[in-house]
Amino acid sequence: MAQSVPPGDIQTQPGTKIVFNAPYDDKHTYHIKVINSSARRIGYGIKTTNMKRLGVDPPCGVLDPKEAVLLAVSCDAFAFGQEDTNNDRITVEWTNTPDGAAKQFRREWFQGDGMARRKNLPIEYNP
């Protein structure tokens, strides 16, 4: 069963953080690429620490080995300097899909005792 094998690596472009630049009086969208560099099909889900300010589209999906997806990370308008942005980040969570599963994302892959991995991408806001 796929769950007994730890999920392999993914790559993100950018690799370590996402940067948004002022002004923040309008919505910004930044694209990141997620690449499945493992030899197994994975299911991925994206979480944000601030759902009011940050959005990701598509928020989840399935990637075959070596397949990539472009995600749109959006930052809604906000009052820069008046809101706490120190802990803002998005987290990519991924797991191997069960053998024989259809290429359609299932939330239950992340429930139970299956192994999942995470990669945090902090958000930096330039004034």
From Swiss-Prot:
GO cellular component assignments: cytoplasm; cytoskeleton; pseudopodium
Domain MSP: from-to ranges: 9-126
InterPro entries per UniProt: Ig-like_fold, MSP_dom, Nematode_MSP, PapD-like_sf
Single Gene Ontology BP annotation: positive regulation of MAPK cascade
Keyword check for Acetylation: yes
Positions of post-translational N-acetylalanine modification: 2
Superkingdom of the organism of origin: Eukaryota
UniProt name for this protein: Major sperm protein 77/79
Species assigned in the record: Caenorhabditis elegans
Lineage, highest ranks first: Eukaryota, Metazoa, Ecdysozoa, Nematoda, Chromadorea
Gene: msp-77
